[in-house]
A protein has these predicted regions:
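Acidic-aromatic substrate-binding/catalytic surfaces of carbohydrate-active enzymes
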Residues: 1, 165-169
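Extended, loop-rich substrate-binding clefts of extracytoplasmic carbohydrate-active enzymes
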Residues: 1-43
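A generic local secondary-structure boundary/capping motif
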Residues: 11, 37-41, 52, 69-71, ...
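Surface-exposed coil/turn segments at beta-strand junctions on protein surfaces, enriched
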Residues: 14-16, 29, 42, 56, ...
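Hydrophobic residues positioned within well-ordered beta-strands of beta-sheet architectures
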Residues: 21-23, 34-36, 47-49, 65-67, ...
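Secondary-structure transition/turn motif
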Residues: 24-29, 52-57, 149-151
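Acidic (Asp/Glu-rich), glycine- and aromatic
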Residues: 44-84, 158-161, 168
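Active-site/ligand-binding surface loops and adjacent short beta/alpha elements
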Residues: 73, 77-160
């Protein structure tokens, strides 16, 4: 829901040392308010995101709270490798794609399910596969990294593994 409505955004800090943006949204269909502070410090290559979610209802409400970062060309190619401290991979019970390399309902020790596939290696564009794989089994400080060997550059995230115990790959 929050990806399709405007956010209230303002710059909290804009100095040579740090830039901080605050973004807030109150959902329309459900009673929640999400606030984010996104900051970037001078000479650091990491963006920090701090979030708070408030239930505006007078009763407990269920929700799905997650993030959907994506990477693609020109960064993502067959020289990329996915590293993580998650220990368990799995697929959903229903197939997502005809070309997926995992049987539905498969659970395995990350990164290799024993079928000759190593999911830590990103397939090439011509691989003709689409896989919906989830990773869990994270410690309290969860992380993943996608490293492009050819370009010698990486992209990664770290988060509270207890608050967000699953990663969609």
């Amino acid at each position: 829901e929050i990806s399709s409505v405007p956010w209230d955004c303002r710059i909290l800090k804009d100095s040579e040392e740090e830039v901080v943006l605050k973004a807030c949204i109150t959902t329309l269909r459900s009673p929640f308010r999400l606030e984010k502070e996104i900051s970037l410090k001078r000479d650091e290559s990491a963006i920090t995101i701090r979030e708070s979610l408030t239930n505006l209802a007078k009763e407990p409400m269920e929700l799905m709270w997650g993030h959907h970062p994506t990477v693609g060309k020109p960064f993502l190619d067959s020289s990329c490798r996915i590293d993580t401290n998650g220990t368990v991979g799995f697929s959903m019970d229903q197939p997502d794609f005809e070309t997926q390399r995992l049987k539905p309902g498969t659970r395995f020790a990350w990164p290799a399910p024993g079928n000759g596939v190593d999911f830590s290696n990103v397939p090439g564009e011509d691989a003709d596969t689409a896989d919906m794989v989830y990773i869990t089994g994270f410690p309290e400080r969860a992380w993943y990294r996608v490293h492009n060997e050819t370009k010698n550059i990486s992209y990664g995230m770290s988060w509270d593994g207890k608050l967000f115990p699953y990663m969609w790959m």
